[in-house]
Every structure is written in structure tokens, then in C-alpha cells.
UniProtKB/Swiss-Prot annotation:
Acetyl-CoA carboxylase is a heterohexamer composed of biotin carboxyl carrier protein (AccB), biotin carboxylase (AccC) and two subunits each of ACCase subunit alpha (AccA) and ACCase subunit beta (AccD). It catalyses: N(6)-carboxybiotinyl-L-lysyl-[protein] + acetyl-CoA = N(6)-biotinyl-L-lysyl-[protein] + malonyl-CoA. Gene3D superfamilies: 2-enoyl-CoA Hydratase, Chain A, domain 1. This is Acetyl-coenzyme A carboxylase carboxyl transferase subunit alpha. Pathway: Lipid metabolism; malonyl-CoA biosynthesis; malonyl-CoA from acetyl-CoA: step 1/1. The keyword Zinc does not apply. Component of the acetyl coenzyme A carboxylase (ACC) complex. First, biotin carboxylase catalyzes the carboxylation of biotin on its carrier protein (BCCP) and then the CO(2) group is transferred by the carboxyltransferase to acetyl-CoA to form malonyl-CoA. It holds the Pfam family ACCA.
Length: 318
């Protein structure tokens, strides 16, 4: 896969280009030990440069990694982590929303319910998925699947990756705020384990609507916020160009959110971000989900609900 590099990754991109150039020179010829040695040195330098850049990302750079066009989405993780995924569609009231995907699957043989936001890569796919911004029917579909999981005693696993709930007139007319609020209420009371992971953007109420859980985790370069940095900047400074300043002030990174005890853990990403190696990222995520699930399965239903309630009530300052 040819990688897309962000502007702050240009030193890495230049090293990658040099490596590719040397590989082309060496391709189809007898092994040139001198060229092989140069490639090896450049790869080591590339690795060190990547470590240096990604160990010093600011909040705005992290937000851009979270939005990377090649970053894995829910439908990239599902086949790498689960088996026998059977997608379920529709809210049984109005329509099917492709910005939310969900269905039954097995995690190492155990039945689970999966729900996640889904963005698109091509223009047609982005339109089909509404750029990952769910409408009310998407959240009502998620609610239907959660209630089904409750009936069949299946753990719920959610993947969060949305810039926010869709703010269109039609969505508001069909009860966007009610759909989100109802999900929050129901998720707080479900008696099955709920494990939520922010895999990309955790945008405001659109993220929270499938984000109330017993365990809430974030990938290393994911973000979680009440509004996008651009939206915040437009309100406070009347220009989206102040987005980097807004991102720093809002505390949107996994590290900052963990310091505030709003999430349980941070899932490590491959060097350079999840898009550099989807298989490795999926393996890390699967390990984290299995660890959380093993801890939660030992609790009774009453204990599960009580601990979830206590977790929610611990937020904020008093």
C-alpha cells in the first residue's frame, strides 16, 4: 500500500523515497551488497526519524493522524478480530444508516454484538457512509442491536470514529437529539458487558451515543472532544485557522483524556500510526478487548450495572 504522508511527516517521506529509488536500482540485478547496506541504513534512519516525530506530536498533529485517509475503520478491524460477522441493517422505523455498521460475530468462538461508526475512502463510499456522521436512524439501529444483545446475553463491543452526529435539518426533524439521549439512557442500564474503543475521531454526542460502557479505551493517536478543533476555533476566534490552538486548549488526545480518568486505557499503535500496519493494530486491539472482557465476565449483572453507574457518576468536579 502506498502511504499518504502528512506535512509534518515529510522527513519520513523523503527517506521512503530514497529507499524506493535504491530498491528500483537493485531490482532485477545481481545482489549489490553496497546498495543493500545503504537501504538497511536508510531503513534504520527512517525508523528513528518516525520515532522522533511521533513521540512529539502536538494535539493538532494527533487530530490529523486520527483523520488519516488510510487509517483503519470499523470494517477493517472486524474481519481481523472477529469471525462469522453477520451484518444487521435498519432501525425498523425509518431507514438503514450506512454510517453505523453492526451485527453479530464471534470473538474466539464467543458470540458478541459489534457496533461501529463507518467512514468511506472513495468519494462514492464517503457519500454512502455520510462521511461517518450518523443520522437518527443510525443510532436507533445501534439501539436495536444493543437491545438484541441484552435479550441474548451477548457482550457489546463498539468502535467509535465520527466527526459528530449529522447536523442536517432532516436529521433534526427526525429526532437526532432524542436518539442520542435514548442511547445514553439505555446503555447505562444494560446488564451485559459493554466495551467501547475510540479508533479515530471521537466527535461529541455522535461518539457518546455508542460510547457509554464498562470499559472505554482509545487508540494511541485517536481523539475525543466535545467539538472539532476547527469548530471550536470558529466560535472562539472566528476562524478555523486557529484549530491548532483550539486543539491544544481542548485536551483531545488519548494521553490527556486518560489523565482526566475519562477512559480506562490507551491501546498502543504501530510506529507511525494504525494505518502503517492494520494487522498489528488489530492484534493489539483484540488483545485489549479480550482482557477487558475477561475481567467483566466475572461480574454479576448487578455488579456490572453498579460499577458502570459509579464510573459515570465519577466524572466531573464537585
Amino acid at each position: 500500500m502506498s502511504l499518504n504522508f502528512l506535512d509534518f511527516e515529510q522527513p519520513i517521506a523523503e527517506l521512503d523515497a530514497k529507499i524506493e529509488e535504491l530498491q528500483l536500482v537493485n531490482n532485477g540485478q545481481e545482489l549489490d551488497l553496497d546498495i543493500e547496506d545503504q537501504i538497511s541504513q536508510l531503513r534504520e534512519k527512517n525508523k528513528e526519524q518516525t520515532k522522533k516525530i511521533f513521540s512529539n506530536l502536538d494535539a493538532w498533529q494527533t487530530a490529523r493522524v486520527a483523520r488519516h485517509p488510510q487509517r483503519p475503520y470499523s470494517l477493517d478491524y472486524i474481519p481481523r478480530i472477529f469471525t462469522e460477522f453477520d451484518e444487521l441493517a435498519g432501525d425498523r422505523a425509518y431507514a438503514n444508516d450506512n454510517a453505523i455498521v453492526g451485527g453479530t460475530a464471534r470473538l474466539d468462538g464467543k458470540p458478541v454484538m459489534i457496533i461501529g461508526h463507518q467512514k468511506g475512502r472513495s468519494t462514492a463510499e464517503k457519500v454512502k457512509r455520510n462521511f461517518g456522521m450518523p443520522r437518527p436512524e443510525g443510532y436507533r439501529k445501534a439501539l436495536r442491536l444493543m437491545e438484541m444483545a441484552e435479550r441474548f446475553n451477548m457482550p457489546i463491543i463498539t468502535f467509535i470514529d465520527t466527526p459528530g452526529a449529522y447536523p442536517g435539518v432532516g436529521a433534526e426533524e427526525r429526532g437526532q437529539s432524542e436518539a442520542i439521549a435514548r442511547n445514553l439512557k439505555v446503555m447505562a442500564r444494560l446488564s451485559v458487558p459493554i466495551i467501547c474503543t475510540v479508533i479515530g475521531e471521537g466527535g461529541s454526542g455522535g461518539a457518546l451515543a455508542i460510547g457509554v460502557g464498562d470499559r472505554v479505551n482509545m487508540l494511541q493517536y485517536a481523539t475525543y472532544s466535545v467539538i472539532s478543533p476547527e469548530g471550536c476555533a470558529s466560535i472562539l476566534w472566528k476562524t478555523a485557522e486557529k484549530a491548532p490552538t483550539a486543539a491544544a486548549a481542548m485536551g483531545i488526545t488519548a494521553q490527556r483524556i486518560k489523565e482526566l480518568d475519562l477512559i480506562n486505557s490507551i491501546v498502543e499503535e504501530p510506529l507511525g500510526g494504525a494505518h502503517r500496519d492494520m494487522d498489528v493494530m488489530a492484534a493489539h486491539l483484540k488483545q485489549a478487548i479480550k482482557k477487558d472482557l475477561s475481567e467483566l465476565e466475572g461480574l454479576s449483572k448487578d455488579e456490572l450495572i453498579e460499577q458502570r453507574y459509579d464510573r459515570l457518576m465519577s466524572f466531573g468536579y464537585c
